[in-house]
């Protein structure tokens, strides 16, 4: 059993290369908390989700709205990787895109296709949120673009880091690659617990790994 108020998210452990990597503690357990603030926030989140569902029911053709939202999200998220296409260009045929922007166009459309694939697999019941689904989506993201030779559909096979020129001076060093299967398995089991009551932890854990 884990008491939320005393939960230690993990620790920095020295690796063979001399740098320190952050190793998250496992979370697939029974969670308890003493603060009433958590219950209040959960109730507020559930209420707002209910309002969102009600709003969706009022839209005559919600699928069109969702498709536009996915396209906008794909465009904005892809800019992190340096793509420079506009929403208008993303809605055009590839033949109408200037040659210097076609790679960016393909990256955005890969993002759209990956999101649609994930939504379909989950809503159709074909696959739950799982490592297998994450890998399938990843393979679509890297299809025919920069990074397509970097093991699409697989977890990373080497150490990465955020900020700095190497792990030793980085702002954040995630767990080493050989721990990913174990950590993702723990996250997957946690996501599918019947008594899960703190879903906001999922996104935090995903970004940590």
Model-derived features: positions:
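FIC/Doc superfamily catalytic core
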Residues: 1-209
